[in-house]
């Protein structure tokens, strides 16, 4: 058996290698601390997919196995794309999970749907600035994706399409499911730039923390975050705490302040009101004349990102000033109501102009807590 230190790095698969008698390695797409992602081609159909390979000799055990578990939970859910081959967990000679043994094989892998460019890459191509139209529509997709993940009892933690640090926030016993009790002092887990201010205090992360990450990401779509140039996680945490919601969302539609006000009303145990956040984002679309079928910024050829629907409609609502303790009564804050008779509801907006998921999708509470 290879020594642990010799095999703990990213898995290197030569181009042309056939894995599991089915997948031929075509190109290397990227790598991390203990894994690598490859472009592969199925021998029989020439269909292309992404393969993530992970060393079996990584201290702390497999994280790929957790990713597969999350993807299996997501299988069959609306608008969720898990894996090209049912998230099957296999080792380097193609056996199923019941026969898996990390002691006998150098690496493990899973084959997944091949997607296009990452959002990070598209953001860079757009000179690190998205229009309000793109910002809000991406926010809707992120919101629904997080809700789906929360419904299958996992938190995102790293806020990425990979689930290597995801954590289940419930306990299952005797056929019952209940939320875990929060720990007093946890390890710092997450992406420093986007994790919630709460995470910096080593407090237990819950569903609201994932949504704070969403808000930070949406804010960055319109301009650099206040801590963008900082590298020390303690300094970043301190800056997050002293940044007001108005400062954070300075270049975003003012309606988004109602989202942060709602998040500040939550604690670890409280379920976020996904429907409320959905309504806020939808109202922002309507007030800024944004159609869901509009092209995203990266789809527009020869047009500056600053053109078109990039300016915030500051006249559509009046947002109350957030106090220094950042606690705001959500009911006192005004945004365009989706119940207004002169304003279309999500169901009245023509297909192609509204999101592919509905208010009912956002309101559904599968866990009951």
Where are these regions (language model features)?
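Juxta-kinase regulatory segment immediately upstream of eukaryotic protein kinase catalytic domains
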Residues: 1-18, 26-27
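Conserved N-lobe ATP-binding subsite of Hanks-type protein kinase domains
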Residues: 36
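Conserved beta3-strand ATP-binding lysine motif
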Residues: 52-56
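Short beta-strand micro-motifs within the conserved protein kinase catalytic domain, predominantly
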Residues: 83-93, 97-108
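A conserved loop-to-beta-strand element in the N-lobe of protein kinase catalytic cores
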Residues: 104-113, 120-121
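Activation segment signature within eukaryotic-like protein kinase domains
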Residues: 138-139
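Activation segment/activation loop of eukaryotic-type protein kinase catalytic domains
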Residues: 160-192
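Extended, low-complexity, intrinsically disordered C-terminal regulatory tails
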Residues: 244-251, 278-279, 286-369
């Amino acid at each position: 058996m290879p020594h642990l230190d010799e095999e703990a790095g990213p898995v290197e698969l030569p181009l042309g290698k056939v894995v599991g008698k089915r997948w031929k390695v075509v190109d290397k797409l990227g790598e991390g601390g203990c894994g690598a992602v490859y472009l592969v081609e199925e021998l029989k159909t020439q269909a292309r997919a992404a393969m993530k390979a992970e060393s079996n000799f990584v201290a702390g055990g497999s994280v790929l196995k957790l990713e597969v578990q999350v993807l299996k939970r997501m299988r069959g859910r609306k608008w969720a794309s898990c894996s090209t081959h049912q998230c099957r967990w296999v080792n380097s000679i193609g056996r199923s999970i019941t026969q898996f043994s990390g002691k006998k094989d150098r690496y493990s892998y899973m084959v997944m749907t091949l997607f296009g460019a990452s959002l990070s890459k598209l953001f860079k191509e757009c000179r690190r600035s998205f229009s309000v139209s793109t910002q809000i529509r991406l926010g809707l997709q992120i919101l629904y994706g997080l809700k789906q993940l929360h419904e299958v009892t996992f938190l995102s933690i790293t806020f990425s399409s990979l689930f290597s640090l995801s954590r289940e926030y419930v306990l299952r016993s005797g056929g019952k499911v209940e939320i875990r009790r929060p720990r007093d002092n946890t390890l710092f887990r997450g992406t420093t730039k986007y994790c919630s201010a709460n995470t910096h205090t080593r407090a237990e992360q819950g569903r609201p923390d994932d949504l704070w990450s969403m808000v930070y990401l949406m804010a960055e779509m319109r301009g650099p975050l206040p801590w963008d140039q900082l590298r020390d996680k303690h300094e970043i945490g301190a800056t997050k705490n002293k940044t007001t919601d108005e400062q954070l969302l300075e270049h975003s539609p003012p309606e988004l302040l109602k989202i942060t006000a709602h998040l500040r009303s939550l604690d670890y145990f409280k379920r976020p009101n996904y429907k409320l956040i959905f309504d806020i984002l939808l109202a922002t679309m309507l007030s800024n004349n944004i159609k869901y079928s509009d092209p995203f910024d990266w789809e527009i050829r020869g047009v500056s990102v600053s053109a078109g629907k990039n300016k915030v409609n500051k006249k559509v609502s009046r947002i109350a000033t957030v106090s220094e303790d950042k606690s705001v009564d959500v009911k006192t804050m005004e945004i365009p109501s989706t119940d207004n008779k002169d304003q279309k509801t999500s169901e009245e907006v023509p297909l192609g102009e509204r999101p592919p998921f509905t208010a009912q999708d956002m309101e559904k509470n599968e866990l009951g807590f």
